[in-house]
Curated annotation (Swiss-Prot):
The EC number(s) this enzyme carries: 2.4.1.-
Superkingdom: Eukaryota
GO molecular function, one term: UDP-glucosyltransferase activity
The organism's taxonomic lineage, starting at the top: Eukaryota, Viridiplantae, Streptophyta, Embryophyta, Tracheophyta
Enzyme class: transferase
The protein's name: UDP-glycosyltransferase 79B10
Coiled coil regions, renumbered to chain: none
Family: Belongs to the UDP-glycosyltransferase family.
PANTHER family per UniProt: ANTHOCYANIDIN 3-O-GLUCOSIDE 2'''-O-XYLOSYLTRANSFERASE-RELATED, GLYCOSYLTRANSFERASE
Keyword Kinase attached: no
């Protein structure tokens, strides 16, 4: 083991960012390092159960300043609907004084951050090294976040001709466009100004995209692996869902989860429900209530609950996704293909059906479907609309034992998972990354 160090972590205030940062913090703490985790107070309460080393990982609360347009009490992106997201980044920027004060008082050796592009300036002022630890895919960073690139257009030399936006993806780019452009500027600025770049991925999945980023930014890109939580270290699956799933045959249940960022229009939500119903398979759906509906039940299609009461559950609340995917009765995962969910799907034994909504999810989906060929994508019309029929066809194509495409993606998925779970591969990424940080900190102290 190298010299122990003290790292600051300042992730973007979204749970899809904070959670993998905390998983990495646990790995660092396991090796004897200290971490100060800078997040809002409310998020601290929601994440503390994931802190496996509370003596080594200390939460440092930040107060979110008031910004016109930001609802009172909002501290993370999950507190506000997408149209209001634009108001939170300026509020996060206003925490800079608090971050500087913490750096001055606690003297970390290293600061890990992702979207707060001013962190390298603070780090340099206090003679601390900065590392941009990115939790979105190298595929999408290389496509949308390189200097001089045009959003939505593959830059020169991009290492894939298959990972492209198509006409029907316009909805994903438009719905996210203003926020995504600002996000893009922040990320590119951070990548250009930080001392080191690291990404939550591995070369077996995204090696050529990581190499492309190294050439674009003239910096070594360090990889941590997927940084998934340790199995069996959290709470078990809730009894009510475990008992419900036990009532179905092995591999027969369709599990649908679209992430906390996706809120469907009511008509599209109903099409989702009807499409899954059309398969005739048992199903478990966990999505946020659609726009204009206070509860999921308010928005369900007429007669739906009565028709599916013995074989379907539709929830508008958070669920234990990794544990549901691991249940023997679950055989298909219908996902938005956020990067965390992408990894969880790969590490599961489920057939994978993808229904992306945001720009990075589209590219993740093309990686899974076109490059790796481990999944199928739900077909959309040019307007971006997906029909109940197209959804049902996609699910049935992978669940039908006689389906050629179903057998192809099953074989490819099985081979890929076999590589990733081979002895020492993913733990090797973690160990090598921690060794790298120890060496970087030691070299910095000798400068």
């Amino acid at each position: 083991m190298g010299q122990t160090f003290h790292a600051f972590m300042f992730p973007w205030f979204a749970f899809g960012h904070m959670t993998p940062y905390l998983h990495l913090a646990n790995k660092l703490a396991e090796r004897g390092h200290r971490i100060t985790f800078l997040i809002p107070k409310k998020a601290q309460k929601q994440l503390e159960h994931l802190n496996l080393f509370p003596d080594s990982i200390v939460f440092h609360s930040l107060t979110i300043p008031h910004v016109d347009g930001l609802p009172a009490g909002a501290e993370t992106f999950s507190d506000i609907p997408m149209p209001l997201w634009k108001f939170l980044p300026p509020a996060i920027d206003l925490t800079r004084d608090q971050v500087e004060a913490a750096v001055s008082a606690l003297s970390p050796d290293l600061i890990l951050f992702d979207i707060a592009s001013w962190v390298p300036e603070v780090a340099k002022e206090y003679r601390v090294k900065s590392m941009l630890y990115n939790i979105i895919s190298a595929t999408s960073i290389a496509h949308d976040f390189v200097p001089g690139g045009e959003l939505g257009v593959p830059p020169p030399g991009y290492p894939s001709s298959k990972l492209l936006y198509r006409k029907h993806d316009a909805h994903a780019l438009l719905s996210f466009s203003v926020y995504y452009k600002r996000f893009s500027h922040r990320l590119i600025t951070g990548l250009m100004n930080c001392d080191f770049i690291s990404i939550r991925t591995c070369k077996e999945i995204e090696g050529k995209f990581c190499e492309y980023l190294e050439r674009q930014y003239h910096k070594k890109v360090f990889l941590t692996g997927p940084m998934l939580p340790e199995p069996n270290k959290g709470k078990p699956l809730e009894d009510r869902w475990s008992h419900w799933l036990n009532g179905f045959e092995q591999g027969s249940v369709v599990f649908c989860a679209l992430g906390s960022q996706v809120t469907l229009e009511k008509d599209q939500f109903q099409e989702l429900c009807l499409g899954i119903e059309l398969t005739g398979l048992p199903f478990f759906v966990a999505v946020t209530p659609p726009k204009g509906a206070k509860t999921i039940q308010d928005a369900l299609p007429e007669g739906f609950e009565e028709r599916v009461k013995d074989r379907g559950v539709v929830l508008g609340e958070w669920v234990q996704q990794p544990l549901l995917l691991a249940h023997p009765s679950v055989g298909c995962f219908l996902s938005h293909c956020g990067f965390g969910s992408m990894w969880e799907s790969i590490m599961s034994d489920c057939q994978i059906v993808l229904l992306p909504f945001l720009a990075d999810q589209v590219l993740n989906t093309r990686l899974m479907t076109e490059e790796l060929k481990v999944s199928v994508e739900v077909q959309r019309e040019e307007t971006g609309w997906f029909s109940k029929e197209s959804l049902s066809v996609a699910i049935t194509s992978v669940m039908d034992q006689a389906s050629e495409i179903g057998n192809l993606v099953r074989r490819n998925h099985s081979k890929l998972k076999e590589v990733l779970v081979s002895d020492g591969l993913l733990t090797g990424y973690t160990d090598k990354f921690v060794d790298t940080l120890e060496n970087l900190v030691s070299e910095t102290k000798r400068e």
